[in-house]
Amino acid sequence: DGESFEAFNTSGGCATMCETYENKVETLSYKTIRYPGHLNHMKFLFNDLHLKKNKEVLEKLFDKEVPRTKNDVIIFFVKVIGLIDGVLQEQTYLRKIYGDENYSAIQLTTASGVCSVLKMYLDGKISNKGFVKQESLSWKDFIENKFGQVYA
């Protein structure tokens, strides 16, 4: 839709997917998407001003100088390239989730993700207990319950 963004790797995003898909997937990339300049601003704060070592000051700075907003957006984008019936194909899934008057997009997506997985567990769609790998969940079951609809 004409908006520009930047994407970069962040820690933890892939979680256990690297091990799960080892020798099954040629390339796995999991990135965060931000408005242009975000990464440089964070590097300046964390590295140049050394606020990575002084999180109390960083937190106070954010609380005082960065306005809170519900006017944010989460971009959920998946691209898969592979063989289907011997033909190389690409499939993509894109969903832009916006905040509303009650909740920011990050609040909506975080809460709905957790609640959707809990609902799946309560409905018996997740049988194991303890740690559950995100890649072991059924996408269909996830988005078909009332909490996962945010992602549908």
Predicted regions and their residues:
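C-terminal catalytic/substrate-binding lobe primarily of soluble NAD(P)-dependent oxidoreductases
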Residues: 1-152
